Amino acid sequence: MPAPALERQDSGIDVHPTSAHFIQQTLKLYATKLKVDASAEHHLPRNYMSRYDNFAQTDRMKQRSLDGRSEGLTLEDVREAATAAQPVFNETVRKLAEAADLDPDAVVLFEGKPLVKNAEKGTVYSRLMIGPLKGEARCREKTRDDYGGDFGQLLDVVRCSIIVDTEEQLIAVTRLLLEGGNVVRLKNRFKYALFTGYRDALFSIVIETPSGVEHVCEVQLH
């Protein structure tokens, strides 16, 4: 759906170039949203995810240092705990994918071709994508802008993405996560899409480190 051009001569209104650019960009964004919405209706006809509301167990949404502290944490405290949680998290999400009958290492296909992640590097998306720890600069920026300087609220230093092909796979992973009892927050953007129409689901899950300290990690479901 091409964005309509502004017709100054028809309306007789002199539109400032900045305003005209803003309007055109808004129309393009809206056209993109309509395409995304149409794609979602095509690929998610049963709307299974609509049954799940967002929720948050705020009393458990706080990181701890490896010595058990939850107050006055530094970024180093959080990253040290994240490093300890990472191997346990990796094993947990691989088992999760396999329990949903997904091959964690399978290459994701789009229109019959591997879905490219980085063309220059020649990398493609796999069913399970486990990222490195969130970078220090981004952690500091997010803590400053979103959490008032409280590093203990960083819940996605350890994270992964699971990419599915079907609505049945989507609901299978969701059910396994929720039935596991370790989800402390769900942001269900399949039900509550972003203004662009983009949809996914973000699960904050508790992982226990080898020393027994809980660490909150993120599973992104696409």
What is the predicted role of each segment?
Residues M1-L154, I171:
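Charge-rich, low-complexity segments
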Residues T143-H222:
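Long beta-strand-rich cores associated with HINT superfamily self-processing modules
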